């Protein structure tokens, strides 16, 4: 925890903090403006049960404490982690912010995680499967946690990220938890360039998804490519949809039926002729 960050005596949980944060950062930029601080602290203190009679005084004190401890950037942006550590315990802080510290580089990495924890291949992550994910996450970061706390944090994560409140997480919910980087394919415009440029772009695209460097896309590499490709035309796809699109792609591209997509097979699917 930042040494300049001294938590207040009264604490929120991660779900409570997230609920307030979203009011001010609705489009999830990851920061709020300095001019919003008073209103933000007012919401926090209201949630913590502060008496109206001392509200303004406490908001002022809290703002002074915060401004003394933090060097607000010239653009007036205040990051979520700067405020979270004032109101959350260390574990709750970690739960909310670990995704900002370790964002995923590619959809292939994301799909490896999705396939591992969607153990029953239902196309959703259940609370029990999310609990397994969090257990591994805490172990990976060398943080000890009891089973009781783990269950509590699983409930917190479901509260924060289960958008439609159906008791399970879909592909998009997990992508939000893991702070997946921007779709790799967005940088390419395959319909607006020459054949040579398309070939060059194809080489870059294939190299990006062929993480294992085998010359063929398989398993989560196919998943990652399908996810990014479909999200170019359909911004939000479910795990069930992804499996359908994956099956269609393999049916069309996997000429030798080995369950993989060779480089030459994908080129053929995209109408390109490449050197062997």
UniProtKB/Swiss-Prot annotation:
Ca(2+) 2 binds at residues 118, 120, 122, 129. CDD domains: EFh_HEF_SCGN. GO terms for molecular function: calcium ion binding. Residues 12-47, 58-93, 105-140, 149-184, 197-232, 240-276 form the EF-hand domain. Transmembrane segments: none annotated. It holds the Pfam family EF-hand_7. Keywords: Calcium, Cytoplasm, Cytoplasmic vesicle, Membrane, Metal-binding, Repeat, Secreted. Ca(2+) 4 binds at residues 210, 212, 214, 221. Ca(2+) 3 binds at residues 162, 164, 166, 168, 173. Ca(2+) 1 binds at residues 71, 73, 75, 77, 82. Ca(2+) 5 binds at residues 254, 256, 258, 260, 265. GO terms for cellular component: cytosol; dendrite; extracellular region; nucleus; synapse; terminal bouton; transport vesicle membrane. Its main location: cytoplasm. It is found in: Cytoplasm; Secreted; Cytoplasmic vesicle, Secretory vesicle membrane. InterPro entries: Calbindin_Ca-bind, EF-hand-dom_pair, EF_Hand_1_Ca_BS, EF_hand_dom, EFh_SCGN. It is a peripheral membrane protein. PANTHER family: CALBINDIN (PTHR19972), SECRETAGOGIN (PTHR19972:SF15). This is Secretagogin. It comes from Sus scrofa (Pig).
């Amino acid at each position: 925890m930042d040494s300049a960050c001294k938590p207040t005596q009264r604490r929120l949980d991660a779900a409570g903090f997230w609920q307030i944060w979203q009011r001010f950062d609705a489009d999830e930029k990851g920061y709020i403006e300095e001019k919003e601080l008073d209103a933000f602290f007012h919401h926090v203190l209201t949630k913590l049960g502060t008496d109206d009679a001392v509200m303004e005084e406490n908001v002022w004190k809290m703002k002074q404490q915060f401004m003394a401890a933090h060097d607000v950037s010239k653009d007036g942006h205040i990051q979520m982690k700067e405020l979270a550590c004032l109101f959350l315990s260390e574990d709750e802080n970690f739960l909310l912010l670990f995704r900002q510290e370790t964002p995923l580089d590619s959809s292939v990495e994301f799909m490896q995680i999705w396939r591992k924890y969607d153990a029953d291949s239902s196309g959703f992550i259940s609370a029990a499967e999310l609990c397994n994910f969090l257990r591994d996450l805490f172990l990976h970061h060398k943080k000890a946690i009891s089973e009781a706390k783990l269950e509590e944090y699983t409930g917190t994560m479901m509260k924060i990220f289960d958008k439609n409140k159906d008791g399970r997480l879909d592909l998009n919910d997990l992508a939000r938890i893991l702070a997946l980087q921007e779709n790799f394919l967005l940088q390419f415009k395959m319909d607006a360039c020459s054949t040579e440029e398309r070939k060059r772009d194809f080489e870059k695209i294939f190299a990006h998804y062929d993480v294992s460097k085998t010359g063929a896309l398989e398993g989560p590499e196919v998943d990652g490519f399908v996810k990014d490709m479909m999200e170019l035309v359909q911004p939000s796809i479910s795990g069930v949809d992804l499996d359908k699109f994956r099956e269609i792609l393999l049916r069309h591209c996997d000429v030798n039926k080995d369950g993989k997509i060779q480089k030459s097979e994908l080129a053929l699917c995209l109408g390109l002729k490449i050197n062997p």
